[in-house]
Design a protein with these regions (language model features):
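Beta1/beta-strand and adjacent pyrophosphate-binding region of the FAD-binding site
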Residues: 1-12, 165-172
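Glycine-rich flavin
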Residues: 2-4, 20-27, 32-165, 198-202, ...
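Flexible, glycine-rich terminal cap/loop adjacent to redox cofactors
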Residues: 7-14, 18-35, 40, 47, ...
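Short hydrophobic core segments
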Residues: 7-9, 114, 129-139, 171-172, ...
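Glycine-rich dinucleotide-binding loop and its adjacent helix/turn
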Residues: 46, 138-191, 195, 223, ...
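A Rossmann-like FAD-binding core segment of flavoenzymes
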Residues: 108-111, 115-123, 188-287, 327, ...
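FAD-site-proximal beta/loop scaffold in flavoenzymes
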Residues: 151-166, 249-326
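A conserved FAD-binding loop/helix module that cradles the flavin
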Residues: 212, 299-358, 429, 437-448
Length: 448
């Protein structure tokens, strides 16, 4: 039986970061992974998605904005196979880097599926492995609704396995994944239809920002269908036909489910360790990533808490600091987490939406500043693209509790503003900051 100070079940970003930090502090650590290192993010998530997004950005620059800048495209050929090949080569290089970090930090890689035997022991390929601390970082998988013919549709995982792009695609869902895939595929030339159950996509985001995204979808010909609940799918001569509860139908070459994710817990034998799930089926943890079992922890998507790769990484490193570096009170701060939706155009946000701020502070205690403009990049062309920015402040000193934007370059603006908001910046601090001109980000420090 091998014994460790700490092991991670799951070799995604969270598990890898946790073990590397533990190893840095001298702990004997191991990562257990049954598939590919890197998890969802590196292999079938944010990394290949971002590369596709860059591809869409280049296509847009060439064909949409290029002519007004004096560049004439001599052809419309797009070699998707080449993009796919280069994308996968990049991912292979990213995965190969883990070996070096494991070696530097003394972390073992154990390949296989882990199952709990008891609270401190797991079985991998029949071998028993024991550890004082066990971290569950197994991530999540796409949820496919239980309706007739659902298996005819694929998931976001399947998109990155396509050897060629389809003629048309129907995407079912309203969150990050649905919106990002819709924007990328549409910009790369796929006839794209996005179906949402309610009145708009991205319902957890500020409505002022989402309104602009919906308008841009309409402007560019990406078809958004609201109040559409799928009832069944069937294969037809024309493709895959979706039947909706309102009696309407839609046929596309491919159908993609982007209707949420479920935790990877089914094969862990959690009951043998005594680990419990919450009402949503995710592993229940406290603010220190502790499960109800002493010495067993969980982080990342398997907990259902802020399902973002940097969150899992930060939570894992913080946990290892607490366990192996004497920082006994170290815990992940889940407030004011910045995030970007790589829609077209991108959305960036940190802190509370206006709606959330009203609930937390009261309508009378908040003040909102907005700006609406056309970025210089598109303003000199015939394809003018709107940008919108918003600051949400609270209290007499107008502390900035929310910052939101949509438009060209927003994805690269948010990180710096997130630091300011984390430090408690006020509207007066923003006003006292000299703007950088001409940029989009100057709008955040010149709003009145």
């Amino acid at each position: 039986m091998r014994e460790y100070d700490i092991i991670a079940i799951g070799g995604g970003s969270g598990g890898i970061a946790t073990m590397n930090r533990a190893g840095e502090h001298g702990a004997k650590a191991a990562v257990i992974e049954e598939k590919k290192l890197g998890g969802t993010c590196v292999n079938i998530g944010c990394v290949p998605k971002k590369i596709m997004w860059y591809g869409a950005q280049i296509a847009e620059s060439i064909h949409k904005y290029g002519p007004d800048y004096g560049f004439t495209s001599t052809g419309n050929e797009f070699d998707y196979a080449r993009l796919r090949k280069n994308r996968e080569a990049y991912i292979d290089r990213a995965r190969s880097s883990y070996g070096g970090s494991f070696k530097r930090n003394g972390v073992d890689l154990i390949e296989g599926r882990a199952e709990f035997v008891d609270a401190h022991t797991v079985s991998v390929n029949g071998e028993l492995i024991r550890a004082k601390h066990i971290v569950i970082a197994t991530g999540a998988h796409p949820h496919i609704p239980a309706i007739p013919g659902a298996e005819l549709g694929g998931s976001s995982d399947d998109v990155f396995a396509w050897e060629e792009l389809p003629k048309s695609v129907a995407i079912l869902g309203a969150g990050y994944i649905a919106v990002e895939l819709a924007g990328v595929l549409h910009t790369l030339g796929v006839q794209t239809d996005l179906f949402v159950r309610r009145d708009r996509p991205l319902r957890g985001f500020d409505s002022y920002i989402v309104e602009s995204l919906v308008q841009e979808m309409e402007n560019t010909g990406l078809n958004l269908h609201t109040h559409k609940v799928p009832a069944k799918l069937e294969e037809t001569e024309q493709g895959i036909t979706i039947h909706f509860e309102d009696g309407s139908t839609h046929t596309a070459s491919q159908v993609i489910w982007a209707t949420g994710r479920r935790p990877n817990v089914e094969e862990l034998q959690l009951e043998k360790a005594g680990v419990t799930l919450n009402e949503r089926g995710f592993i229940q943890v406290d603010e220190y990533q502790n499960t109800i079992v002493d010495g067993i922890y969980a982080l990342g998507d398997v907990t259902g808490e802020k399902e973002l790769t940097p969150v899992a990484i930060k939570a894992g490193r913080t946990l290892s600091e607490r366990l192996f570096n004497g920082k006994t009170n170290a815990k992940m701060d889940y407030t004011t987490i910045p995030t970007v939706v790589f829609s077209r155009p991108a959305i960036g946000t940190v802190g509370l939406t206006e709606e959330e701020a009203i609930k937390e502070y009261g309508q009378e205690n908040i003040k909102v500043y907005t700006s609406k403009f056309v970025s210089m990049y598109s303003a000199v062309t015939s394809h003018r693209q709107e940008a919108r920015f918003k600051l949400v402040t609270a209290g007499e000193n107008e502390k900035v509790v929310g910052l939101h934007g949509i438009g060209y370059g927003v994805d690269e603006m948010i990180q710096g503003f997130a630091v300011a908001i984390k430090m408690g910046a006020t509207k007066a601090d923003f006003d006292a900051t000299v703007a950088i001109h001409p940029t989009g980000s100057e709008e955040f420090v010149t709003m009145r």
